[in-house]
Amino acid sequence: MPQEHRANAILPCSDLDASQAFYERLGFALASDYGHYRILSDGSGWHLHLTQTSGGWLMPGHNPFGIYLYVEDVDAVADRVRELIIEPGAPHMKPWGTYEFAVSDPDGVLVRVGRSH
């Protein structure tokens, strides 16, 4: 059987516990724990790798990395993180045709959650 092609993000984290708790609210669960390196899964094929890092890699407000999570029930996910949503009143339709909202993870990574219409 051929190997499935996919890509996984590896996110540097200043606090693994805080990052894991944040992504669990977005629907991920711990799949593997190697101490300083954790793998989260959504149960449908997504994997997110979190790695403990020391300071110096992050400039607050200037993190150039982001993640887009496509989900069917955007509103259900938004309800789990309502107080963290960046734009008040979100989720909403964007001019480019997605229904989405955005949050920042504990290290300032932009996380957009949405679906195409």
Residue ranges and their predicted role:
Residues E4, G35, W96-T98:
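Loop/turn position at the start of each blade in beta-propeller repeats
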Residues S14-D17, I67-L110:
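Vicinal oxygen chelate
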